[in-house]
Amino acid sequence: MYYPLSSSLMFFILFSLFYHLPCESSKCESLFQCGNITASFPFWGGDRHKHCGHPLLELRCDQNKSTSLFISDQEFFVLHVDQTSYSLTLARPDLLHSFCSLTFTNTTLPPEIFELSPAYKSVTFYHCYPVLPDLSNYTCPVIGPISVSGNPEDHETCFPNFAANVPTSFVTKEKKLNIANLESVLEKGFEVNMNVIMKACQACSYSNESCGFDENFPFEVKCKPHHSPTDTSLSIGAKAGIAVASVSGLAILLLAGLFLCIRRRRKTQDAQYTSKSLPITSYSSRDTSRNPTSTTISSSSNHSLLPSISNLANRSDYCGVQVFSYEELEEATENFSRELGDGGFGTVYYGVLKDGRAVAVKRLYERSLKRVEQFKNEIEILKSLKHPNLVILYGCTSRHSRELLLVYEYISNGTLAEHLHGNRAEARPLCWSTRLNIAIETASALSFLHIKGIIHRDIKTTNILLDDNYQVKVADFGLSRLFPMDQTHISTAPQGTPGYVDPEYYQCYQLNEKSDVYSFGVVLTELISSKEAVDITRHRHDINLANMAVSKIQNNALHELVDSSLGYDNDPEVRRKMMAVAELAFRCLQQERDVRPAMDEIVEILRGIKDDEKKRVLVKSPDVVDIECGGGDDVGLLRNSVPPPISPETDKWTSSSDTAASL
């Protein structure tokens, strides 16, 4: 039957389409303003949309009207912006106060965006033993003597600690630094020049357009038209072209709206007919008798509420999992009233199927293309994986469902995060042996994924579930990627959770297995410290747990990092094992991904730590400074002794828990 499109509906469609067009383009005409800082291209932030500037150059304004820029995993205060010379003055917040109180880190900026002004120079701070008289020296109360050089030389007794930028005039003719004024100089910041393509931006201004960037990688400058309804500078030909284009666009939109309206009505009728005529039967390529409540989906229908996932319903070889109706999952979850928490791209609810199985049902936040792709991605990855430490996917809803839902086994004991620093931590804290088992099982699951060519990309303690026996179930594969075996990396925009993202992936947009290794290093640090990966209530140098851990280990202060309630202070055996795990975490958290261990090696190291009852555990690391954590029983960090890695079997697995997870 033909249904004419009502005039009110057509007006709404056209209005909604055209109403927002001038708003988006006009946002690029807005300036970022904060205190005494005013900026335009290539920056964005505030009233300027992200597409109006370089994706990495977001300016932020705090309550004190101070402007900041977060780039290369470091925060910088923006003291001055010169749009004429395309330069700006930056200062590190951690250098604005007492020099000796900071956690030493290098000043790093992406060279494709910034270059240090010729008026400034990078100087290196050293630890020298003994102190060399030909270098400027400065003594910090806790750290001890620090030597500074504007022109570093090869001193066998000196080890570089970190680098910072100072004016060239600060370096004397004798190539030494006037260290007495070091703090005041660092507070004034340093100047950098922008390397982004400014000529392309000038070309935009010639055509009365605004500068912006596309969302592809590598980023390219794009000219975006201004919105100016009163602009009379257009030629008659240009105006005629615009008029013709507008009329053509209007005609296309009218036809498209008419087509969509008719199609939606037909789909609604087809869906109603299908739901009434289909019998209740089993649908599972693995077990045809396990759940009598599932629904057989008709493969003869050619219509789809979501065409991008239409083959989920009529291709059992695509899903390989059971297909549930929306109504039975709505009933199982008591109308989605028993919320368990967030699950990456959806909310997770507790439910009980008619056959008695307890399940966790993930409900998509929204039906955007990105969410649908994550929905499909999780099914595609989990359907073919079997491992005792990976969560089991029972099934999903069909294309005729009102909403997209995923159905998993229910893991009753919460997340690892809840047990380490959440609402379960105080009631029954995890003992050290349990934490070590959790580390081994998580590493085993990741090693299995890497063997299968899969990068998880979002390993964190909230995605590590625990059953009643504290056996690990790694979950949430919405961001996971299949990794081609013949490639060294995948170029993709960084995704993941702050505090867990590999800094090299963040800076270079290159993803590989070692990105998971870095995230796992953060998890190891949480296991030994019971601290959150990111905690803004900590000292500003310790907000990021990974940075805090590396600093504490490098400065022989592991006792300030670990959870003393685990027996670190009074049990020598626990102390040695915790130090060995800390050493392994230190290797995983290295900035250079090439020096991080592979997951199969990590599994063997952790098993060696668990099985060692009397020997001191030593962990090797190539070309990393040898640091000892003080004390007679301390183990030297990162020495050259480690069991040789072996290739894990893909079809035989051992678990540190005696009992499998109960459903």
UniProtKB/Swiss-Prot annotation:
Catalytic residues in the record: D458
Family matches, as InterPro entries: Kinase-like_dom_sf, Prot_kinase_dom, Protein_kinase_ATP_BS, Ser-Thr/Tyr_kinase_cat_dom, Ser/Thr_kinase_AS, WAK_assoc_C, WAK_GUB
Extracellular compartment residues: 26-241
Superkingdom classification of source: Eukaryota
Example of a GO biological process term: cellular response to hypoxia
Reactions performed catalytically: L-seryl-[protein] + ATP = O-phospho-L-seryl-[protein] + ADP + H(+); L-threonyl-[protein] + ATP = O-phospho-L-threonyl-[protein] + ADP + H(+)
Name of the gene encoding the protein in the UniProt record: LRK10L-1.4
Low complexity bias: start-end ranges: 290-304
Glycan attachment points: N36, N64, N106, N137, N208
Sequence positions that bind ATP: L340, G341, D342, G343, G344, F345, G346, T347, V348, K362
Assigned protein family: Belongs to the protein kinase superfamily. Ser/Thr protein kinase family.
GO cellular component, one term: plasma membrane
Catalytic activity, EC: 2.7.11.1
Keyword Plastid belongs to the record: no
Signal sequence annotation: 1-25
Membrane-traversing stretches: 242-262
Protein name stated in the entry: LEAF RUST 10 DISEASE-RESISTANCE LOCUS RECEPTOR-LIKE PROTEIN KINASE-like 1.4
Region span, Disordered: 282-304, 637-663
